[in-house]
Structure formats: C-alpha cells, structure tokens
C-alpha cells in the first residue's frame, strides 16, 4: 500500500535519522546496511527477499565492483525490477540454488520476518557463505509475550512476529556467531508513523484510488498503534551481523 501512497517500490520502513520523506528514509536504510554489513570488504552478495532489487541497485551504485544477486519468491517483483546490472533469481529462502561457499555476504533487509521456517533459511545461508562470510539481518521483532498488546497490528502486520530471544536461539542453534547487534526501533517506527499521520491527506487520496476508505482507515489506525507500542518498547527493529565461523 505504501508503494501506491508514497510512490516508492522499496519495501522497508526506512531509517529516519536525516530523511524527510519515505523514499529518502528507505534509501538511508539501504545505505546504512552497507556500513553495518561491511560491504567495503565484500565481493559477492546475495540479497534474499530482495523485492524489486532497489536496495541492491543502491549498493551497486555505491560499489560498482560488487557482484550482487537478488533472490525473491515473488517473480512479479523481480520481473518489474527492470534491472540489468544485477542477477535476479526466483527462489525460496529455504532452498537457495547456489553451491556451497558461493558468497561472502548474505543479506535479508526486512525480509526474514516472512521466512518460514526461519531456521531453514539460516542453515541455507550458512551453507552458501564462505568461511569468513557474514549473514546480515534487518528485522522487526516483538517483545516476549506481547502478542495481545499489538492490537490491530496483529491483523495488518502481515508477517511472523519473531522475538529477539527466538532469533538469538536460532543464531546459536544454526552455528552462527553473533558479532554485532543494533537496536534502531525508535529511528524506524515512530518517524515512519509520524510521516504517514502528518501526510495523511495526500497519502489517503492516492491510496483510495486502489483501496477502499475502510482499508485506509485501518492503515491510519495501524500507524498510531505502531507509534504507541514502539514508544513502549513492545516492538523493536534490530540489525544483526553474524559470522559463519569464529
């Protein structure tokens, strides 16, 4: 829906440190991942759940020497990416169609919350990583035992609601080493919700050309709820950098 309302095909909430619009925030998030994931020392990257490949295009523009592969289960998004400088693969996160040790980075930028089972993705990511490779995640999480506190987001947040402890257990159980973690929820959810609320009139006009007014009202209520529970630390947004080996 935000693709229609805000004229952007990037499928992330954005990082709102220095960004006035959703597109700017999404670009800022994509650029920050290159720093967090240490792309400067990478050569070959697999972006899992890549959507329209726009973050990958940003990474390629910043470092033209990177060999980047976009992989997504949704063929229509890959097809509509109109990308001729990045390889595109239509496949599932649980069956990555590459040989062992093919990449030095595997990235899941706000996509791993859709992967079921998550453990299978971790196993596959570890398999295709080189011995000195890294798995980099940007993922929404909820506080332990807080499902009932999500309210309307239980309906409108169309993904798994993983907890930080579940993800860390999965990291340990699949043989990864947690090297770096960062909490950025306050720079994601609250400004994202504020952006929608402050620009609701113009965004609503665009949304109701495709969806009903009732759907837009659900979006608006979801934004208010998102801001509320982010301020209460019921939801967070975490970045993880994982080493394949010690």
Question: Where are the language model's segments positioned?
Answer:
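A short glycine-rich, Lys/Arg-flanked "PGG" loop and its adjoining helix->strand segment in the class I
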Residues: 119-134
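Conserved catalytic loop of SAM-dependent methyltransferase domains
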Residues: 180-207
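C-terminal lobe and adjacent flexible extensions of AdoMet/dcAdoMet transferase-like proteins
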Residues: 220-246
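Class I SAM-dependent methyltransferase SAM/SAH-binding core
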Residues: 46-95
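Short alpha-helix
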Residues: 159-175
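A short acidic, Gly/Pro-enriched loop at the edge of an enzyme's catalytic core
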Residues: 94-106
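Conserved alpha-helix/loop element of class I SAM-dependent methyltransferases that forms part
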Residues: 23-41
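Short, glycine-/aromatic-enriched active-site segment of Class I SAM-dependent methyltransferases
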Residues: 140-159
């Amino acid at each position: 829906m935000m693709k229609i309302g805000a004229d952007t095909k990037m499928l992330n909430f954005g990082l709102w440190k220095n960004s006035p619009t959703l597109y700017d925030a999404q670009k800022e998030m994509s650029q920050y991942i290159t720093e967090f994931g240490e792309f400067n020392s990478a050569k070959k990257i697999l972006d899992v759940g890549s959507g329209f490949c726009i973050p990958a295009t940003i990474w390629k523009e910043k470092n033209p020497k990177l060999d980047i592969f976009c992989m997504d289960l949704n063929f229509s998004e890959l097809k509509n990416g109109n990308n001729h400088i990045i390889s595109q693969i239509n496949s599932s996160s649980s069956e990555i169609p590459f040989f062992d040790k093919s990449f030095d980075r595997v990235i899941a930028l706000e996509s791993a919350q859709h992967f079921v089972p998550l453990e299978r993705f971790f196993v596959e990511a570890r398999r295709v990583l080189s011995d000195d490779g890294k798995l980099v995640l940007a993922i929404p999480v909820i506080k332990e035992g807080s499902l009932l506190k999500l309210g309307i987001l239980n309906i409108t947040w169309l993904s798994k609601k993983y907890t930080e402890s579940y993800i860390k257990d999965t990291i340990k159980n699949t043989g990864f080493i947690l090297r770096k973690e960062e909490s950025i929820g306050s720079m994601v959810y609250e400004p994202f919700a504020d952006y929608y609320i402050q620009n609701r009139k113009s965004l609503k006009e665009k949304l109701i050309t495709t969806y009903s007014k009732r759907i837009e009202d659900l979006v608006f209520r979801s934004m208010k709820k998102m801001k509320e529970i982010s301020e209460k630390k019921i939801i967070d947004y975490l970045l993880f950098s994982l080493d394949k080996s010690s």
